Amino acid sequence: MALLPFPLPFAELEVGHHLYWQIGDLYLHGQVFLSSWILIGILLVLVLAGTRNMQRDPLGLQNLLEFLWNFIRDIARDNIGEKYYRDWLPFIGTLFLFIFISNWGGALIPWKIIELPEGELGAPTADINTTVAMALLVSLAYFYAGLSRKGLRFFELYVEPTPIMLPFKIIEEFTKPLSLSFRLFGNILADELAVGVLVYLVPLLVPLPVMLLGLFTSAIQALIFATLTAFYIGEGLHEAH
């Protein structure tokens, strides 16, 4: 998500100064790389701590992890179906957990204490390159699911119920990743900017309601992304009616 052969035009949408590392002909977005791995590390620690001494009657962190597992399982099963959802549960669960912890980490972790030569750390999902990369992964998963299940018959859905739908179906394939990526990016970036401005202007209790609303919105965005991912995969797997 952070490794690019050249700086993408999407990077122009970012706000402020940014840190890039050049490795040969590749450009590595330093802020996204660092914040992503910090958050992945936190997630791994939480998972290992919650599954270290598992009990028959779950308590504490184990209970929370089992709740999340059941929640993600229900999303996958409802949208993909009983027959195929298990194959896609790790993919959908990984996306949901990464987006969720990225969104909340961007709001709760005091990133400013980590000083960088340029820019500052923040939520990886507030960077357009991250959200576009995840949206493209979802598109690839959709095509893989359809082609692996139906072969070339997968492309019949582009001319159903009538061939006149072909151009509209093609346009739809481009709008899916665009809507996924820009919805997540726009909401998280707007939340970070709003909180940042309020903290700068009124640094006491006024920003707190906005931060709480931002946490709620961040959780909803993770849910929307995971649900749409499962829906698209289910759409690719099932026969058109």
Swiss-Prot record:
GO terms for molecular function: proton-transporting ATP synthase activity, rotational mechanism. CDD domains: ATP-synt_Fo_a_6. The chain crosses the membrane at residues 30-50, 89-109, 128-148, 193-213, 214-234. Keywords: ATP synthesis, CF(0), Hydrogen ion transport, Ion transport, Membrane, Thylakoid, Transmembrane, Transmembrane helix, Transport. It holds the Pfam family ATP-synt_A. It comes from the Bacteria. F-type ATPases have 2 components, CF(1) - the catalytic core - and CF(0) - the membrane proton channel. CF(1) has five subunits: alpha(3), beta(3), gamma(1), delta(1), epsilon(1). CF(0) has four main subunits: a, b, b' and c. Key component of the proton channel; it plays a direct role in the translocation of protons across the membrane. Belongs to the ATPase A chain family. This is ATP synthase subunit a. It comes from Parasynechococcus marenigrum (strain WH8102). The lineage of its organism: Bacteria, Bacillati, Cyanobacteriota, Cyanophyceae, Synechococcales.
